[in-house]
UniProtKB/Swiss-Prot annotation:
Species this chain originates from: Solanum tuberosum
Cofactor(s) the protein needs: Zn(2+)
Region of interest: Disordered: 184-203
Enzyme class (EC, first level): transferase
Protein name: Acetyl-coenzyme A carboxylase carboxyl transferase subunit beta, chloroplastic
Amino acid sequence: MERWWFNSMLFKKEFERRCGLNKSMGSLGPIENTSEDPNLKMKNIHSCSNVDYLFGVKDIWNFISDDTFLVSDRNGDSYSIYFDIENQIFEVDNDHSFLSELESSFSSYRNSSYLNNGFRGEDPYYNSYMSYMYDTQYSWNNHINSCIDNYLQSQICIDTSIISGSESYGDSYIYRAICSGESLNSSENEGSSRRTRTKGSDLTIRESSNDLEVTQKYKHLWVQCENCYGLNYKKFLKSKMNICEQCGYHLKMSSSDRIELLIDPGTWDPMDEDMVSLDPIEFHSEEEPYKDRIDSYQRKTGLTEAVQTGIGQLNGIPVAIGVMDFQFMGGSMGSVVGEKITRLIEHAANQNLPLIIVCASGGARMQEGSLSLMQMAKISSALYDYQLNKKLFYVSILTSPTTGGVTASFGMLGDIIIAEPNAYIAFAGKRVIEQTLNKTVPEGSQAAEYLFQKGLFDLIVPRNLLKSVLSELFKLHAFFPLNQKSSKIK
């Protein structure tokens, strides 16, 4: 009869790793939490700071191709962990009936003659380390037919690279559940089973209604990276300038955050804050009227329109600045956006101020028809007077995404054009081009790095350097901080 060898481990202490690892991942044993909170000993309180990774990616290849591990946490809850490297299967289960059978076999084998003949685990972190034989008639796949539930998801933060050998989290159930907000409710009272694919690997998740509620409850605390699909804690993301701490990708920023990044504290003076759209062409949609949609975005973002304009100081240098906000109807340019930017340019021309416009837009706003298209010409006309007649300095900053009418007008009219790393910059989007021309758009052909090589703009500047770069550019063009300017006049 065919038999299989398995490794089984029963940890002496709780299954525990902190997010900041304080032991080499080369060792498989549990790591003690030196800053343990006594409140965490309560059985029904879970914390992601309590447990982190089970294994590092490099550890997984130290095991044979078909392994099962038995682990126990500080609450006495046991879990079986099953690896099938050859078939790329990773499953975790806390099925009590199966675990009882496993522990029974484990205990019987521990007292067997094989163990008494001298086999001992060498790792001091294990209570025991052993191998035992198990008849395949019981079918391990049937016993371990469900994987980690949300309790372990919130504590272990499973790295899908264990399964796929890559650093991508894109198809992970855990990350989808936290970030997408998709409905995970089940008609079953006690829980349900969900199977997903992760880079060609089968992953079965056992869910419970309480776990799903926890997932939805804390979803708002995280922001998922568009590039690596890793999770970034929202509370810390702002201090990191909305740059992914895992891959360095520049995530979208609100207009208020950009103003805070560029403008000196206490110097911001907004303009035309009370200007709102009145639905000039009375655009009506069966799904949602235009005015209702405007109202919903105003409540959601706290803004009146898709751009903020005003006067402020950048390292002491007075500047006029307009910042578009993609969160407000995709940063689309309607009559109010066009009017606010035009007034900003005219005010900068009258006050002899350098001008900055931060672009983040999907283009002209279709709900306002040709009036939105006319904003392109109106803004370009105001810039013509500002740049050629007044001989003043305009810096255009292109962020992701900058497309459509904004790209075709003031986005590309800067005396200096700066792009953020990996910014998506185009006139027509990839999908529109492919559907119109029936041609495939090459991957990366609308990214900032590729367009920079083609000479489309002057600089690619990371966010952490942007303010200092702008300051040097203004000084180069004879715009100095107020205190330096007054001292030179004296």
